[in-house]
Structure formats: C-alpha cells, structure tokens
C-alpha cells in the first residue's frame, strides 16, 4: 500500500507516476484485449493495471468523495484530526459487512502547505485509512467554486444561464479544471486499489467523470456511483455543452444510484435522447445495455443514522437545551425551518407563506412562531447575497406588521447553531416546514421525526402519544417517502399558508397516526439500510465481470469497455479460407443492409465489386449463396439480376427464390392478408399523431417505424400501438413484434431462422448435406439465423462434422461466435473466398484438360 502522497502535481496531472500495487499471485483470467484466452505474463500479473485477482481474499470498499469524513484543525503548529460523525460517508459504513475494510479518498476542508502534505497523508492513512487529495488553490477554486457550484449545481437544480449573472455561462477552462481534478482523484485511487478485490463507490456530481479514468485503467473494476443531487429533465440537461461526455463517463460505472424515480427517469431519458440507449426493467431491476455491459440503475433514497441522532438527543438533554427552549417558547406554537443559505431552499417563500397564514388566520397572531435557522452558504456568488437581503427584508416587514412586545412571529437565526441546539428545537417544534424549490434529498424531516419520537424514559419524553407534523415541498427528494406530510408547491404562497394553518390545526390523533407511519419508515430505512442495499446490487451486477472478455474502445470521454463472451472473437479470414477450401458442400447466408451495404449509404444498390465477388462464388458448384433480407423481393431481384445463380430470401424469408431463373415460392403458413386491412388504419392513425414516424408497406408485412420521431413519445406510442394490435389481432395468424424503433406485423412462422432451416433441409434432401456454413448479419432479425444454425446441428440438418461460422457485423453482444468490424471487412472476406473458388475452378479445368 502506498505510504506517501504525491507533491509534484504537474507530473500527477500528466500521468507521469510510478505504477505500484499490492503483491498478488498469478491466476488465469480471460484477457482484457481481443485474443486467445491465456495466462497473463509476469509483468501483467504484478502490475496495478492487471485484472488478475490478488491473494487477499476479502473484499474492500474504497469510498471516493469530494470531502473526507474528517475534521481538521491546526493548533500550535501541529495538525489535529478527528472523524466527522455527521458525515454521510462515515455513517454509511454501518451497512457494510463488519469484516470489510474501508478506505476513503477525498480532500480536506482546510488548506495544507505543500511541505506538510506528505506527513499529513501518512498520518491520515495510518490512523484513519484516508487518502487525501491535495490541489493547488487556483485549481480548487476553478473546480469547486467554478464548475461545480456555478455551472453543474445550478443546472442540476433547473437554473439555466440566461445571463452572465444568472448561473454563469459555460466556461471551457472551468470544465478543464473539473476534468483535471477528477484525474487527481483517479491518481489517488490507483495508489491504493487492488482492482479485483476492491469495490469503488464514487459520490456526487463533483466526480462524474472519474468513472471513465478508472474504467480505462481497470476494465473489470467493480464501481458504483451515487448522485446526491437532483438530475434535471432532458430539456434542461441538453443545454450543457459537455452533456454527452458526462453521460458516457457515468455509464462507465456498473451501478448508478439516484434518490428518486424522477431523477433516474430523467437520466434514462437523457441516455435515450442523446445516446440512443434503451433501458429494460427485469424482475424489479432497471438496466441499460451499454456495449455488452449492463449498467444498473438504483433508486434508493438515503436515510439517517439513528444512533447518531439518539446520541445527540441524549447530550442535548444533559445540557438542558430542551427545557431551556420550552421555557422560552412557553404558550407558543413553534414552526421550524432549517436550511442552508441557498437560492434553491425557498426560505423567502416560507416567510411569505407564514405572512399569508397570519393575515388569513388572525387567531395565530401572538401564538405561532416560525424559527428559521440558516446554515452558512456552501458556495459563493451574487445570488446568495441577493437572497440573503430578501430574507432579512421579509423578516423585518413581517415582524414589524405582526409583532408586539414579547412576541415576534419570525425568529431568524443566521449564526452558527450547534447540533445539540438544533435537536432541542426539533423537540419543541409542532411542525417542520421545508419549502425548497429543488433539493436532492433533504434529511431535515427525517431528523425531526426521530427527535419527536424522543428517548424512552427521558426527561424530554413527551407525556402522551408521540406526534409530529410536516409541511414539505413536493420538489425535495424525501417527499415521496413521507406520505403523511402535507405536500405543497412552495411557489403557491397562498396554498402553502393554508397548509401551515392545516398542520397547526390538525387534531393530535391525526398527528399521531402520521407520525407513527413516518417513524416506521425512517427507522427501518436508515443510512445502513441504504448502503447495504447499494452494495448488494453492486455485487449482483458485477458477478459476471470475470466471465467476459473486455477491451476498451474510444478516446477521451468517448471511451467505453466492450464486454463480450470469451468465445466471441474476430473471424480470421486466412482461417476461414482454409476451412472453405476443404469443404464439399457450402451454404453462405448473407444479410443485406448493414452487411453488404452500410446502413447509412444513400445509394442502397450493391456495388459492382460486391456483385462480382458474389457471382464468382455462385460459379463454384460447391456453393449455395443466399441473400436473406427484410427488403421486398422486387428491389432485391432487380439489384441481383447479374448474379444468375444466387438465391434470395425476401421479407425475412416469406418469399424464397433458389436462383435467378426460378420462380418465387412462399414460406408462410398462410396466404390470407386480410389482417392488413385491420392493421394499416391503426398504423396510419399513429403516424398522423406521431411526427417523424412512417409506414413501410411490404407484400407480407407492415412496419411502423419511428426512428425520426421524438424518442420518448415515439416509444410511448409504439408501446400503446403494440398492445392495441395484439388485442385486435388475437385471432389472426400473425405475429406482432417490436424492434429497434419499429413495430412490425407479419405472418406467423416467418423469420430468417425458419427460412435458413428450410435451406439446410432442402440441401440435405437433395443429397448435398452442408459441411460448411457461413452466416453473416448485423441486426436483431439476423439473430434468428444464428440461432437456427445451432438448431440445424441438433436436428441433423448439417453434416456431423460441419464447420459453422455465425458472424455478426460490429463488436456487440450476439448469438454469433464471430464478428467482423464493418461492411468493408465483409467485402474483403468475400473477395478472399471468391479468389479461393476461382483458383479451385482453374485447377479443375487444368485437370480436365490434362485428362
């Protein structure tokens, strides 16, 4: 383990650092780059970048956050450090296994001189298992005060930079500082990580690009990310100039956590609209398929530490704080607000709502008191000073209008308040009010509920039933979990004022019922429950890491790891040519779009080069060549007229022609297309109401495609259409299927797989059982062909020793065992096979002439 921290930050940022790691024994693993399965060499086995497991068998958790869970103070020239008991990152260890070692990587809340950094790092590592990250002051300012607080924080809270003074326009230099800082965190993680035994849990928006640095270095690292702030809707997020870079960086995690479904839904929508990714929900788990990896989406609001609050409550009693406040507010009904000085906390809206209640319900004048505690601002900026001025002006106005000797309706506290005193306020408050206009979670209501439950048998224990009341903004993360709270739209000041009156006027019995319901939830869904649940899901989603072959692709933040079956490998042209030459009866099945022709090609007709290669292959008597496509038979017949001996399976095999001179035959079970009269009007209706969609009318099928429509609306319409068509076509001999941006209705039993089996069966029936199969395709419909080849072997439609090459175009998850990168490689392979056939035919002619 590393014992010293780096001080040369220029070397660190540029990546010039020594590779160090814990010693480990060598074990065979699947390689992380394309190639054969083998053991790593000695250098790889002892490199920190290796994916080999260590000799240490127990798991370890590395928690990476912007701030370490430490308090630091320098006294008389020496440093003093202690745990910050209120830090979430310290509290979450309660939910992790007792034997799991925990390391923390993060920065300190104080500046440390460069000549002291090594000594401080050693102390923190030895005594606290913390690895500090140190930054130059200018980088820290650009990273935290600049990009994090002026750009990401406002945007994630739905504030667009309409002007230079409103949220801050995008500054490329601040983004570069953000990336550089994330890279420094990465350098610290690799000092201590054992990539095969450790879990890495990254926290919050400060470190959103860190997953890319770690995934690039360690392809199989087990890594989770949790966002503690809101995630904005796609309409807001898309305004960020580096939107795709951040999304792709987050997707290098294995598990991404959010507090609420709304935040997760916004993230999934952004991935759909900006990256074209689709998510699936299986058995209660949401996952995004991303280049062979499943990125899990976790929805779990964080909880509080019950033990910590109980301890503080006990201490508050010992100090007499509770009794002191009860005496001070005797005869008054206390409402309580505790917020950071932040433009999103809605503090002034709360004051206006209190003013509204006092104006509309005079009976509360002289009785109701709102105690508003304001914590220091975490960020800097003109917005904070403006909102502070508004709050202070509202307090003066309301107290001036409704106050009297011995009574102030608003008690505004903007000086530091100890946690013991805050807990005492929780005890005496009849209602806690949270009016944030946007907030990630906000645990104030949870803390209040626990404090109102009290300590059994204590001096502050309520006589009679426990009760509490909440008025909570519907825009905070904890709101969905508190069904007994009065939810408000804080922008509607009048309605919020009425909610305050309702909360204070509610019967004690009703308050008791709501309190009991809330306490049951809060006490069972604490921070330990949250961290334990996250780790369990992270373990589940990473269980197959070492069963797949992984390699990295892309540069910069376009980097991603492709994870595929270890048996999935690139088709070697020399090897297949060698096997091709030895075969006596060959079947070659080729998809068209995306296989012989690029998908984005404007001219869809095959090139003369491709036609020449196919024609040469058809001239070989050992070959049976088929184009198997979803296209109509008219266009395919026209394009492949020069290849007289080529077979064509059109419309996914509904129509089949064995060669150019033969007639078309149908492979469907039914020739009745009356169902089209039902389907076409339905599709037309959805086309008219879905901009960007269209209908493709084939002889045997109807396809509704929405590739150019709004992804979210198109997907919604497709799902509704699918259900509608399945209902009205229940008694028709058709199959209704959804695909990649399509809904297709076609006759039952029609697929590329079924026509492939028919071809193999026919060749076997003619005494030419196939001993060589080459099948190439690029999309979902071609997966049926790949599956049919396996079925043909078990059904003995092929020779027992048949050589089978199922090949997909592009490196992606597939039932095929081989891949070629693109259509150019497919053409090169066809050229090599054609040359082999021509050479064989030439040899045969020479032999005939010699005889």
Swiss-Prot record:
<keyword id="KW-0597">Phosphoprotein</keyword>
<dbReference type="InterPro" id="IPR001830">
    <property type="entry name" value="Glyco_trans_20"/>
</dbReference>
<dbReference type="Pfam" id="PF02358">
    <property type="entry name" value="Trehalose_PPase"/>
</dbReference>
<comment type="subunit">
    <text>Binds to the phosphopeptide-binding site of GRF/14-3-3.</text>
</comment>
<protein>
    <recommendedName>
        <fullName>Probable alpha,alpha-trehalose-phosphate synthase [UDP-forming] 7</fullName>
        <ecNumber>2.4.1.15</ecNumber>
    </recommendedName>
</protein>
<dbReference type="Pfam" id="PF00982">
    <property type="entry name" value="Glyco_transf_20"/>
</dbReference>
<keyword id="KW-0808">Transferase</keyword>
<feature type="modified residue" description="Phosphothreonine">
    <location>
        <position position="32"/>
    </location>
</feature>
<comment type="similarity">
    <text>In the N-terminal section; belongs to the glycosyltransferase 20 family.</text>
</comment>
<dbReference type="InterPro" id="IPR003337">
    <property type="entry name" value="Trehalose_PPase"/>
</dbReference>
<feature type="region of interest" description="Glycosyltransferase">
    <location>
        <begin position="59"/>
        <end position="540"/>
    </location>
</feature>
<dbReference type="GO" id="GO:0005992">
    <property type="term" value="P:trehalose biosynthetic process"/>
</dbReference>
<dbReference type="InterPro" id="IPR036412">
    <property type="entry name" value="HAD-like_sf"/>
</dbReference>
<keyword id="KW-0328">Glycosyltransferase</keyword>
<dbReference type="InterPro" id="IPR006379">
    <property type="entry name" value="HAD-SF_hydro_IIB"/>
</dbReference>
<dbReference type="GO" id="GO:0016757">
    <property type="term" value="F:glycosyltransferase activity"/>
</dbReference>
<comment type="similarity">
    <text>In the C-terminal section; belongs to the trehalose phosphatase family.</text>
</comment>
<feature type="modified residue" description="Phosphoserine">
    <location>
        <position position="5"/>
    </location>
</feature>
<dbReference type="InterPro" id="IPR023214">
    <property type="entry name" value="HAD_sf"/>
</dbReference>
């Amino acid at each position: 383990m590393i014992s010293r921290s780096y001080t040369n930050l220029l070397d660190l940022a540029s990546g010039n650092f020594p590779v160090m790691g814990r010693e480990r024994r060598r074990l065979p693993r699947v390689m992380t780059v394309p190639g054969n399965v083998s053991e790593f060499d000695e250098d790889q086995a002892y490199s920190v970048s290796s994916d080999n497991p260590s000799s240490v068998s127990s798991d370890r958790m590395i928690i990476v956050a912007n701030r370490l869970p430490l308090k630091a103070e320098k006294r008389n020239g020496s440093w003093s450090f202690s745990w910050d008991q209120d830090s979430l990152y310290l509290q979450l260890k309660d939910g992790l296994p007792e034997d799991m070692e925990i390391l923390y990587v993060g920065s300190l809340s104080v500046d440390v001189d460069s000549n002291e950094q090594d000594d401080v790092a050693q102390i923190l590592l030895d005594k606290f298992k913390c690895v500090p990250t140190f930054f130059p002051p200018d980088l820290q300012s650009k990273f935290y005060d600049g990009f994090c607080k002026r750009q990401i924080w406002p945007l994630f809270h739905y504030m667009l930079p309409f002007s230079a003074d409103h949220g801050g326009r995008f500054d490329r230099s601040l983004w570069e500082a953000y990336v550089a800082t994330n890279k420094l965190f990465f350098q610290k993680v690799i000092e201590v990580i054992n990539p095969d035994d450790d879990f890495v849990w990254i926290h919050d928006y400060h470190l959103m690009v860190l997953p890319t640095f770690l995934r690039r270095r360690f392809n199989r690292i087990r890594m989770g990310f949790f966002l503690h702030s809101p995630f904005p809707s796609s309409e807001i997020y898309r305004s960020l100039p580096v939107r795709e870079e951040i999304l792709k960086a987050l997707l290098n995690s294995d598990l991404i956590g959010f507090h609420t479904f709304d935040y997760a839904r916004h993230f999934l929508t952004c991935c759909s609209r900006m990256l074209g990714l689709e998510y699936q929900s299986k058995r209660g788990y949401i996952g995004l398929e991303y280049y062979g990896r499943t990125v899990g989406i976790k929805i779990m609001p964080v909880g509080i530490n019950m033990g910590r609050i109980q301890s503080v409550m006990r201490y508050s009693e010992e100090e007499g704080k509770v009794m002191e406040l009860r005496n001070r507010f005797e005869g008054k009904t206390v409402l309580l607000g505790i917020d950071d000085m932040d433009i999103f906390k809605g503090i002034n809206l709360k004051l206006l709502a209190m003013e509204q209640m006092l104006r509309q319900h005079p009976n509360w004048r002289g009785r109701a008191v709102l105690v508003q505690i304001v914590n220091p601002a975490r960020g800097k900026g003109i917005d904070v000073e403006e909102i502070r001025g508004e709050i202070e002006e509202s307090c003066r106005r309301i107290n001036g209008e409704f106050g009297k000797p011995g009574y102030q309706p608003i008690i505004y506290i903007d000086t530091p308040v100890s946690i013991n005193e805050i807990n005492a306020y929780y005890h005496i408050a009849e209602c806690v009010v949270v009016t944030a206009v946007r907030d990630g979670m906000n645990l104030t209501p949870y803390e209040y509920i626990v404090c109102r439950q009290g300590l059994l048998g204590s001096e502050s224990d309520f006589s009679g039933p426990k009760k509490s009341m909440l008025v909570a903004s519907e825009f905070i993360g904890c709101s969905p979990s508190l069904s007994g709270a009065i939810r408000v739209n804080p922008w509607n000041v009048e309605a919020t004022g009425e909610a305050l009156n309702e909360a204070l006027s509610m019967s004690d019995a009703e308050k008791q019922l709501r309190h009991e319901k809330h306490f049951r939830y809060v006490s069972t869904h604490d921070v330990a429950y949250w961290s334990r649940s996250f780790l369990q899901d992270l373990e589940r989603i990473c269980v197959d890491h070492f069963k797949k072959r992984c390699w990295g692709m892309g540069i910069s933040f376009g980097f991603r790891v492709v994870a595929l079956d270890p048996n999935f490998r690139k088709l070697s042209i020399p090897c297949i040519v060698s096997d091709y030459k030895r075969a006596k009866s060959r079947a070659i099945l080729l998809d068209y779009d995306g296989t012989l022709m690029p998908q984005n090609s404007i001219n869809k007709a095959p090139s003369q080069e491709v036609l020449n290669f196919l024609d040469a292959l058809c001239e070989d008597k050992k070959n049976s060549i088929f184009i198997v496509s979803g296209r109509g038979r008219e266009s395919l017949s026209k394009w492949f007229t020069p290849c007289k001996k080529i077979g064509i399976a059109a419309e996914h095999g509904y129509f089949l022609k064995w060669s150019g001179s033969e007639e078309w035959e149908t492979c469907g079970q039914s020739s009745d297309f009356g169902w089209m009269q039902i389907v076409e009007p339905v599709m037309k209706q959805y086309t008219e109401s879905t901009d960007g969609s269209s209908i493709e009318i084939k002889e045997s099928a109807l396809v509704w495609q929405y590739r150019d429509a709004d992804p979210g609306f198109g997907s919604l319409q497709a799902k509704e259409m699918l259900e509608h068509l399945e209902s009205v076509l229940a008694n028709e001999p058709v199959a209704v299927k959804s695909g990649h941006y399509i809904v297709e209705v076609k006759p039952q039993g029609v697929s590329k797989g079924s026509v492939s089996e028919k071809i193999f069966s026919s060749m076997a029936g003619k005494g030419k059982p196939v001993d060589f199969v080459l099948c190439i395709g690029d999309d979902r419909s071609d997966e049926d062909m790949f599956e049919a080849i396996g079925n043909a072997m078990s059904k003995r439609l092929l020779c027992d020793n048949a050589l089978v090459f199922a090949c997909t175009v592009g490196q992606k998850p597939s039932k095929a065992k081989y891949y070629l990168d693109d259509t150019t490689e497919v053409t090169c392979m066809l050229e090599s096979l054609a040359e082999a056939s021509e050479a064989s035919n030439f040899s045969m002619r020479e032999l005939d002439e010699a005889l």
